[in-house]
């Protein structure tokens, strides 16, 4: 269904719509979603991902924040 949730080693999670990271959960921040509008389909994916979360508890963040969360697992590898 072109939706993937990635669980990171630090307990955070990143939600992807197609291949784009658009939402997730981070300790210290809580639930977050992108401030960028991609498409109506991606918006539906995000809304479905947060179906059981009060919208007042979701922080809107820029894409750089989400990418930095994705890079967490890559730090110290090699």
Where would I find each of the regions flagged by the language model?
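Terminal leader/tail segments of proteins
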Residues: 1-78
């Amino acid at each position: 269904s072109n939706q993937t949730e990635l669980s990171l080693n630090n307990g955070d999670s990143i939600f992807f719509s197609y291949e784009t990271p658009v939402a997730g959960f981070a300790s210290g921040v809580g639930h977050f979603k992108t401030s960028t509008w991609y498409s109506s389909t991606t918006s539906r994916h995000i809304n479905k991902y947060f179906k059981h979360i009060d919208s007042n508890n979701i922080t809107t963040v820029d894409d750089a924040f989400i990418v930095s969360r994705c890079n967490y697992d890559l730090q110290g590898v090699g």
